[in-house]
């Protein structure tokens, strides 16, 4: 069986989304269209006799940084080299950029052999955030803040500027994007979106634990409004305040990944990152 790897269309990716759901990755309802907006050439499918058997994404953000995700092989065809062949074909899309990924424990040794070094662990916390005792104050819809201020805040928390991603991410169908404003200044923002099971929160960027707490409560309330009392939040252990916040709301760890890179990245405000945006695109 000969594997042929080619770029995937948005229509092709509907099948990959189904694979993700089967794997328990809880894909967001509107993720694919936003992901493709960032880099429509960064999605790949491997086929045998015309049938899709593998997938991967290598999404370029700028001239220096790329992110790898969606590394999948159909379960009945694993162990035949299709995954590695797909990986090698797609990784060329990154060129000489530093590549990041969030790897599950079972694959981390393989990623190390491919030149990835661990930076920190990320734990997914899942559960039902209790309704706050009183209305959350200082949190507004993100469209009420200056777009340039929002973009600058996001850029401080991510290894690359990502305007092609950010604008649709905060406005995609079903997404609820909220900003924390303190004394007229933007001090955080977050997004919650419907997904296959629990609603997913990400990013959750904030100046302080108090700002993050207000945003988490407000985002969880928004999730209830679209029928999702339970949320899933991917929190980096590099910011210990993130786990403390999750545990204070009764969320429980579900699984963990490791953020890994092939080289240097620009500095980020790690103490502001209470939840990463997605495990698929970083």
For every predicted segment, state its role.
Residues 28, 33-54, 67, 121, ...:
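A short helix-loop-beta-strand connector motif used in the catalytic cores of GNAT acetyltransferases and
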């Amino acid at each position: 069986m000969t594997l042929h790897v080619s770029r995937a269309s948005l229509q092709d990716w509907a099948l990959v989304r189904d694979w993700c759901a089967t794997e328990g990755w809880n894909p967001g309802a509107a993720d694919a269209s936003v992901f493709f907006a960032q880099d429509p050439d960064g999605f790949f499918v491997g086929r045998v006799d015309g049938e899709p058997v593998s997938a991967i994404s290598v999404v370029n953000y700028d001239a220096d940084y790329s992110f790898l995700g969606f590394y999948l092989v159909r379960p009945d065809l694993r162990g035949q080299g299709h995954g590695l062949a797909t990986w090698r074909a797609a990784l060329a899309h990154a060129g000489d950029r530093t590549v990041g990924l969030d790897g599950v424990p079972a694959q981390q040794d393989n990623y190390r052999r491919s030149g990835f070094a661990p930076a920190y662990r990320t734990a997914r916390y899942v559960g039902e955030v209790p309704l706050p005792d009183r209305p959350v104050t200082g949190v507004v819809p993100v469209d009420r803040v200056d777009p340039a201020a929002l973009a600058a805040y996001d850029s401080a928390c991510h290894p690359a500027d990502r305007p092609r991603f950010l604008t649709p991410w905060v406005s995609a169908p079903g997404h609820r994007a909220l900003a924390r404003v303190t004394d007229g200044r933007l001090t955080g923002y977050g997004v919650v979106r419907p997904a296959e099971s629990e609603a997913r929160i990400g990013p959750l960027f904030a100046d302080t634990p108090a700002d993050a707490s207000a945003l988490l409560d407000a985002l969880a309330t928004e999730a209830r409004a679209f029928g999702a009392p339970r949320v899933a939040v991917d929190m980096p252990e590099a910011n210990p305040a993130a786990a403390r916040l999750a545990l204070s709301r009764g969320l429980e760890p579900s699984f963990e990944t490791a953020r890994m890179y092939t080289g240097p990245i620009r500095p980020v405000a790690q103490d502001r990152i209470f939840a990463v945006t997605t495990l698929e695109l970083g």
